[in-house]
Amino acid sequence: MADINLGQLAATTLQKYQPKLVDNIYKKHVILNHLKANGGTVMYNGGRQLVVPLMYGTNSTVQTFDGTDTLDTTYQEGIDVATYDWKFYNVAVAFTMVDKIKNKGKEQVLSLLKAKIKQAELALSEKINTDLISGSDAKGLVGLLTMSDATSTVGGISGTTYSWWRGNIDSKAVTVSFSDMRAVKNSCMNGNGGSKVSLIVTSQAIYQKLFALLTATYQFNPTQAATKEGKRLAEASFEMLEFEGIPVVYDEAMAADDMFFINKDNYKLGILEDANFAVIDKSQPSDQHVSIQHIVFGGAAYTDRRASLGQMTEKKSA
């Protein structure tokens, strides 16, 4: 039997699997899934930073007039930009000569390759998802915990300094309630430039508490969603409730007492075209019998309106 070129087989296998890998990542994690299905993932071909225009003021020159009335042409402030740095993630898929020796035959080697690729896929997707929720590493994505608060600097703009650049927060240490959820939800939808909250994400503990508060009829058929997005998420196998027309889901990466309110129109994931879970050609160290493939992701989580985002923290589920 001809000798198996492990590096070549690994490269070919990973390249063929890459589209499925991307699909799996978006299927597994509900925030990514929601953004992907609703125009919340935006492709970029590069640039030093991701620059996002903001509108934080109103135009005061709006007026009624008649005939030869003088029109107000006062120059308007209120336009700014937020800048987000690109963040990069890498996972290595390594195969050694010993792997090949211990797994004789192409089928056995291929089985090992697929297992290692799946392992890399899961590790990379978990890391990106966790950072998307609560990331605080300067090299990683800005997490929702930071992006939806009221004081952090996001996109180069301080929430402490500018009141219009703040999320809506409820940090009272009380048992979660629909009335408190309603207050945060409504605050996220107030003002110009925003739109309806499109997804509420919480922990399993809080989700189960909300489920217990619902009627027995709804508990009997919890996937009987009223909204299009609710039905889509249920059909995608996500556990889902609806609160005033908004899907409520849970994610394992959420802190036990947290809840986030997301608006797909104002919260996005920018992705670099050349680093969209790209497979990088193999490298072989000169001092080791190792063949290495890399899977690379580059992007930035961003918002153009923090006031459209909300968070509840310190909520009790019992």
Regions found by a protein language model. Give the residues of each.
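Flexible, glycine/threonine- and acidic-rich loop/arm segments that mediate assembly and lattice contacts
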Residues: 1-318
